């Protein structure tokens, strides 16, 4: 019974992905480059672009999130789907927002990543989208109880959470947050040049369209630079 149920879920997911791809089947290079989206309204530009180093030619989309965020769950889903559909052209990475005064999200996120518990991290993002629930789980003892309910080894979690490696990753997260000028969340950076915030990310169709526009714009800029 479980086999057939799993098979059905797999088939449904494949159909959903094919439908989404069909709706999005205009190739990125065929999207017309025109001023249908405006800087300062639909997206924002860095005055000084941040250098992005990648081994391949794909455009980097960086998503900054916080566990105390009602919109971040939807943003994560939107970007995951966009990344799947456009896997040849873009790569999506996610980072926790961190300041010296707010270590919670970064330390918890990197601890769960170290434990290969990405699914639990996703569940926590959904769980803490409610402000009241976030305040509860932001207390370490309550978080450990919740993690135990998710079958996470809390002793190992605590050991990793307090490790030097996680402290180092937290410091890197603080630097990254400051370097990218993250002032809200969700905060999505495209190739170190353009930024999307909740004013765009609240709607999946809107987000897809603006991303297509910016990815096409960046691709054109690269081609023109190579021709010079």
Where do the protein language model's features map onto the residues?
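C-terminal cap of thioredoxin/glutaredoxin-like
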Residues: 149-228
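Extracytoplasmic thiol/disulfide redox context detector
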Residues: 6, 19-101, 174, 216-228
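Structural alpha/beta surface segment adjacent to cysteine/selenocysteine redox centers
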Residues: 70-148
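A broad, low-specificity signal for short, low-complexity segments enriched in glycine/proline
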Residues: 26, 53-56, 69-71, 108, ...
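Conserved short-loop catalytic and cofactor-binding motifs
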Residues: 67, 96, 131, 158-161, ...
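Bacterial N-terminal signal peptides
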Residues: 7-16
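Positively charged n-region of N-terminal signal peptides that target proteins for export
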Residues: 1-5
